[in-house]
Amino acid sequence: ETALRGVRFNNTWVPSETYADSRRGTLTGQYPQRQATTRISEVFAGVGYEVREDTQPAGEDVFRLLEQPSPEELDQVEGVIAVCSLLGGNAPMSVLWPGVAENGENNELVSPIDLAPTLAAIAGLDVRPNARLSFDGLNLVPVLRHGASGHAALFFDNGVRMIDAALIDDTATPP
């Protein structure tokens, strides 16, 4: 949680009960059930970005994928920074976008699968529905810039979660 920077999302739900499936969903921007294999880092590499998995100095157009970085490592990185946890249920997530999303909290319903389309949109890639680059996740740029709504619902193997209710493992809340 100390690694969170920028706008903190308080209503963030991981896409799967398992870490491996949540990781796949986050790296692809697709629900894990799709078994997608194209990672967001490959998308950025395909449009000319240098892809790095470290904090070493790099060129101007660089996409960094740092898994489980320390807060000190994140302090070395400049530009847009997205941080999330994939450890069960309501998990911490934040987006730092200098000049746009530098602090505050947001209570919209979101998921780590939203990071891939959000980062792609910030980089100027076309992430509109039916674009060549397709994601299940929601582009959070309108949420960050204009206070737009997040998801109406998130769908999981074991149920569905909405803003004000959930049906998970045959248990409804509120009942």
Regions found by a protein language model. Name each.
Residues E1-P175:
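Formylglycine-dependent sulfatase
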